[in-house]
Amino acid sequence: MKETVANHVYQVISDELPPEEWDLAALNAELLPIVPLNKIVLTDAEKSSGKVDDLVARLQEETVALYEQKEKEFEDFDLREIERIILLKVIDRKWMDHIDDMDQLREGIGLQAYGQRDPVVEYRMAGFEMFNDMTKAIQEETTGALFHVQVEQK
């Protein structure tokens, strides 16, 4: 969860910009559907420090606190089992998608030879990038599902 928060913040906000120019609207649009935090605004300390790391640390703390609150809602249930089930389902779905994507890549990689590039190297590089994208998507989807899971009693 902490890594998901950090990835989104660093993707949207640059340390090179002053805090007044940070795109908090984009950060809210990226992060809030995954982690249901309150609307993200800068504190005075974050404005004065100008460090993205301070914002990341605060958002990570809020995320952990929010998840601990979620754990209290599930006292009667085995939350670790729910986490395991969600993670396995997400991994299974993303892995199957990844296998399909790799098959499509293999079918189309021959065109790289026309561009004077080694198809094996291009396949390896594209496959590595696709695998990294898959692992990031697994983290995001699992985090989002854990925060939005609800147990209905019959």
What does each model-found stretch correspond to?
Residues 1-154:
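Extended, charged helical/alpha-beta scaffold domains that provide interaction surfaces
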